[in-house]
Curated annotation (Swiss-Prot):
SUPFAM superfamilies associated with the record: Anticodon-binding domain of a subclass of class I aminoacyl-tRNA synthetases, Arginyl-tRNA synthetase (ArgRS), N-terminal 'additional' domain, Nucleotidylyl transferase
Domain of life: Bacteria
Reaction catalysis annotation: tRNA(Arg) + L-arginine + ATP = L-arginyl-tRNA(Arg) + AMP + diphosphate
Record's keyword terms, sorted: Aminoacyl-tRNA synthetase, ATP-binding, Cytoplasm, Ligase, Nucleotide-binding, Protein biosynthesis
Family classification: Belongs to the class-I aminoacyl-tRNA synthetase family.
EC number, as in UniProt: 6.1.1.19
Keyword Oxidoreductase belongs to the record: no
GO molecular function: arginine-tRNA ligase activity; ATP binding
UniProt entry tagged with the keyword Aminoacyl-tRNA synthetase: yes
Intervals of motif 'HIGH' region: 120-130
GO biological process, one term: arginyl-tRNA aminoacylation
Designated gene of the protein: argS
Protein name (record): Arginine--tRNA ligase
Length: 563
């Protein structure tokens, strides 16, 4: 058990609050002299009808100090000072015993969480914006799993719409079969762009495209075969990119999957008297909720995104009976999801409150020097390739004899990019600056990976140590601060999931790496006459690395053993 839980259980014996509520109230004091954990008593004053200061004093006097150095009250706070030796022993032992499971809990046992993320459009290339949803969603997916939830990763592919009618027309006229097999997305994009250029000169192409899409909607054999081919070729290409990123999904049910599930939604909304006609379209009025109408059917009877998202939500609830369904989609779609969730609520689905939109910002470049295949969008392939190439330049300059250079460059380069996406609050825009991203100093992915490799080197050189571990020897400020950081791992994961904010975990991993380097720079680990102290510090190094490795894994980043 971590000390935060121990503090919470101690308080629980004396107050009428649930353990989860107590844990959320517990704070880390700003100064070490104020204790290691603090419990504010403001919330109890209404219930207990006493001043917070008085409650704090009463709690302090009634608590056992077993496992603590001391417990004090300071104003409205109860401050807990842990027994450093016992604390270090409990924390480090748990980290080493749990290994890759350190930080895990069973808080989500028996509950299912759906996470929708990535969701690219078929026949279009991944651009840098796609990595935002993919990185955030992948990290949330991994964290929910770590907390014991049955987690379902959903890739809601953009695999339906009028663009497929255009693609069929373009395919019939201009496709290069060899290019299509070799680089499918590039070729499909080329003929799609060509279609728009030609349609400006010959508007009848648009009519033909509409007819093609109508044929696809009615199950025409040729149109369906081409659509299936476009989808399969695109998925193969997407899979290649997902493999580079180490991302997997449990379902690839895209927009097309819900084609036969939308009539049920429309009929339900009609039966419940929610659908009204507006300018020929069928809409749900949301004016009293300060939102524009939610269009369910267009004037020509065609469905739109909202209809599909309503159908998807209902299908997911029926199929997975989710505890929570998280949609990782850009912030500009916030209104769309508010409308969809409100329509679900008005239709009587109380579980609409369990649907959550997780928005994120834009991706910008500090110098726009990233090489691209066209001026308007930066392709993800180009970004990742350049990251790996620039990392290789650094390796060749600093350690040209390094083994497995290509593999190391890939892990550091791709990891640096993912780390940048997850470093700051997700709603903030990202500004890419290669110099900063690939720096081995500061708050970057390479800095954290370098810290891990540095620690690994220490462990390899300390293998012959014969000392006996004695945690009471870890008495310095740097050692204790590092142990405290290690102990906070599970609380950080819980908070990151509570806020649906992976950057909380990213900042924590940086904090552990910094704490490890601070400790190592202040204290010798290997050059010690005291073998027992050496053995104890080696265990502290091992526990630090376990946390860094587990933390990076939850962010979707690999560690590098040597660099």
């Amino acid at each position: 058990m971590d000390y935060k839980s121990k503090v919470a259980e101690l308080i629980k014996k004396h107050v009428e609050l649930e353990i989860e509520a107590i844990e959320k109230l517990i704070e880390i004091p700003p100064k070490p002299e104020m204790g290691d954990y603090a419990f504010p008593c403001f919330q109890l004053s209404k219930v207990m009808r006493k001043a917070p200061n008085m409650i704090a004093e009463e709690l302090k006097n009634s608590m056992s100090t077993d496992g603590f150095e001391r417990i004090e009250n300071l104003g409205p706070y109860v401050n807990f000072f842990v027994d450093k030796g016992v604390f270090a022993e409990n924390t480090i032992k748990k980290a080493l015993e749990d290994g890759e499971n350190y930080g895990a809990s069973n808080i989500g046992e028996g509950k299912t969480v759906c996470v929708e993320y990535s969701s690219p459009n078929i026949a279009k290339p991944f651009h840098v914006g796609h990595l935002f949803t993919t990185a955030i969603g992948n990290s949330l997916y991994k964290m929910f799993k770590k907390e014991g939830y049955n987690t379902v990763g959903l890739n809601h592919l953009g695999d339906w719409g009028t663009q497929f009618g255009k693609l069929i027309s373009a395919y019939d006229r201009w496709v290069d079969e060899e290019a299509l097999e070799k680089a499918p997305i590039d070729e499909l994009l080329r003929i799609y762009v060509k279609f728009h250029e030609e349609a400006e000169k010959d508007p009848s192409l648009e009519d033909e495209a509409r007819a093609n899409f109508k044929a696809l909607e009615t199950g025409d054999e040729k149109a369906t075969a081409l659509w299936t081919r476009f989808r399969d070729l695109s998925l193969k290409e997407f899979e290649r990119v997902y493999n580079i990123l180490g991302v997997k999904f449990d379902s690839l049910a895209g927009e097309a999957f819900y084609n036969d599930k939308m009539d049920v939604v429309v009929n339900e909304l009609k039966e419940k008297g929610l659908l009204v006609e507006s300018n020929g379209a069928q809409v749900v009025m949301l004016e009293e909720y300060n939102m524009p109408p939610c269009i369910v059917l267009k004037g020509d009877g065609a469905s739109i995104y909202a209809t599909r998202d309503l159908a998807a939500a209902m299908y997911r609830k029926k199929t997975y009976d989710f505890h929570k369904c998280v949609y990782v989609v850009g912030t500009p779609q916030a209104l769309h999801f508010k409308q969809v969730f409100k329509v679900l609520e008005l239709a009587g689905h109380e579980w609409a409150k369990d649907c959550v939109h997780v928005g994120f910002g834009l991706v910008k470049f500090a110098d726009r020097k990233l090489s691209t295949r066209n001026g308007s969008i930066v392709l993800l392939d180009d970004l990742l390739r350049e990251a790996v190439e620039k990392t290789m330049e650094v390796i060749n300059e600093k350690n040209p004899e390094l083994e497995n250079k290509e593999e190391v460059a890939k892990k550091i380069g791709v990891g640096a990019v993912i780390f940048t996406y997850l470093k700051n609050s997700r709603e903030k825009d990202i500004v890419f600056d290669w110099k900063e991203i690939l720096s081995f100093d500061g708050e970057t992915g390479p800095y954290v990976q370098y810290s891990y490799a540095r620690g690994n080197s220490i462990l390899n050189r300390g293998k012959e140590c014969t000392g006996t571990v004695d945690y009471s020897k870890l008495s310095s400020k740097e050692e204790f601060e590092l142990v405290k950081s290690i102990a906070n791992f599970n609380s950080v994961i819980t908070l990151a999931l509570d806020k649906l904010e992976p950057s909380i975990l990213t900042r924590y991993v940086i904090e552990v790496a910094k704490g490890f380097n601070k400790f190592y720079n202040a204290h010798s680990v290997l050059n010690l006459e005291d073998e027992d102290l050496k053995a104890t510090r080696l265990n502290l190094v091992k526990a630090s690395l376990q946390v860094i490795k587990n933390g990076l894994e939850l962010l979707g980043i690999d560690v590098v053993e040597k660099m």
